[in-house]
């Protein structure tokens, strides 16, 4: 199922969960191509829009954040060609903003998190976002010792020999610098050097390069440093990793210090004191962009004070104190050749517009998701009109397609002047195109309104749903069975021989045994062989013991992504405890139900979906057979060395005065605590500020430890 194209607030939670699952896989694929192989298949604007879409969905549906979410990941795993380097401090990416309103929201979030009033000015830096390859360069006692790419943010590739060939990067620093210095910045190729290189390649009859960014990245990953040296790469310093001493206390002054040490820094960087100044500088840089000798794709804003940066801290993959304001993408006109229906794992029928191929910003676009029948008619999920009444999307229509923001590719509108007289309104099917079952629109339990998604009622008799469930089960972040991909699942599902059929998950693990007693041998079938079949059985057997969160995620419970599965595994510890809790929570009341809802990140909609899943006899029957074949491992509990609150569940209540609630939560979680929104038997500590009410009363009633803010600060500081 696919839903990219409509505003996130028009999506149901089911649509959002399915789209987040797909986005995680798609972005991971492009990360591997971009960061690991320097061979992107889509433009930066297209990639940014996918990330933007993912982030927007997670803001709207925080309970659906997945463990493999792009918001929890940076880049891609490092190549095996170069030796790995573990970064002393992670190299995180930045959140993106795409409009003035986004920038205003970012600045407001900084003030809000810090508890600052608008008249309590906070300075920001603003600098061009260089379109190159991120690099971390480590100096010890003033000498360059290691240079590493970002990689996945935790581990990069050792490219020290190649970095030494870049003339702009000093091999030695001046006397008096800290003993350990890690300079971070961007390696890039100047436009003029790129054009000169391509002219040289043409003269030699060789294939030319696509763009400066890919050329720079490929040049830096040469096994022969002489090739790198010939490419005239350049560098801008703008950040740091590990520093044994801090030479300054602001972002701006740190960068100026790097300049004093001999590193090139961007001359367009400014220190500014208001949103208006920030946006004005964005416009100024945008005007200068065509004349710059290097590619940029936006402007980066950072809180200037390092003390405030420390207070703001980090999200899973990005700092709260910085954002990248991206430049806008492009639009184009094309024709809707056909509207097709896809059926997803949850049965949702999603219309897809097949477009006459059109190039938008250097990338060929051939389709766009239309989300649901209301969207085709120009109506949002809340019933509001998102296009004029007669601007419904029809086959043969000329439409405006955009690749930017949180909707890529998105059909913005219909060009009515080009609509032909024979264009007919699209009739959305009332039956599933795969199995023929009725397709109905359900009542949204969260809003009480009719969902815009139409869903097949066929369940597991629907081939599309059943095969998608199996593909989800064996996917990379679930059971991850090598050799059992989409093509193989289709083969086993459709086969008529009982010894080769796989139509439910347990049958994956009985395949080898069934084959032993069968005359129809898998190894004799085209596409398989004795060696590959042996490897498949080995891969299956290696998954008979599986991490609990992977097992829960693999079940395919609606709304339960990887993040939720990990929260559940950590909270319940064993599958037996988890399954018992789901059974006891069936009445949607009582301690088990309350405990489930008290888990941070588990909302009522998600909790209800989990309980309903375990109420379905067929699901229980399949899981029972599955447990006979596999063993979910006991979940490992996170350990934060030296933290007195590691592993404890903490609830904050009342009006906090020493810190904001967001700041308190972030600090507690950084120390290994779990922050819950309600008090239960599993709560360990309740921190009560002035005005604490029912939560404090309940804590005392349950005998939970309570303390005020000063006692809490003393505890975590000790």
Curated annotation (Swiss-Prot):
Catalytic activity: NAD(+) + (deoxyribonucleotide)n-3'-hydroxyl + 5'-phospho-(deoxyribonucleotide)m = (deoxyribonucleotide)n+m + AMP + beta-nicotinamide D-nucleotide
GO function terms (MF aspect): DNA binding; DNA ligase (NAD+) activity; metal ion binding
PROSITE patterns to which the protein is assigned, alphabetical: BRCT, DNA_LIGASE_N1, DNA_LIGASE_N2
Cofactor(s) listed in the protein's UniProt record: Mg(2+); Mn(2+)
Family annotation (InterPro entries): BRCT_dom (IPR001357), BRCT_dom_sf (IPR036420), DisA/LigA_HHH (IPR041663), DNA_ligase (IPR001679), DNA_ligase_AS (IPR018239), DNA_ligase_CS (IPR033136), DNAligase_adenylation (IPR013839), DNAligase_N (IPR013840)
EC number: 6.5.1.2
Gene Ontology annotations of biological process type: DNA repair; DNA replication
Record-annotated active site: 129 (n6-amp-lysine intermediate)
Binding residues for Zn(2+): 432, 435, 456, 462
Binding site residues for NAD(+): 44-48, 93-94, 127, 150, 186, 302, 326
Keyword Zinc annotated: yes
Residues annotated as domain BRCT: 640-718
Record-linked HAMAP family: DNA_ligase_A
Function as written in the Swiss-Prot or TrEMBL entry: DNA ligase that catalyzes the formation of phosphodiester linkages between 5'-phosphoryl and 3'-hydroxyl groups in double-stranded DNA using NAD as a coenzyme and as the energy source for the reaction. It is essential for DNA replication and repair of damaged DNA.
Protein name (Swiss-Prot/TrEMBL): DNA ligase
Organism whose genome encodes this protein: Rhizobium leguminosarum bv. trifolii (strain WSM2304)
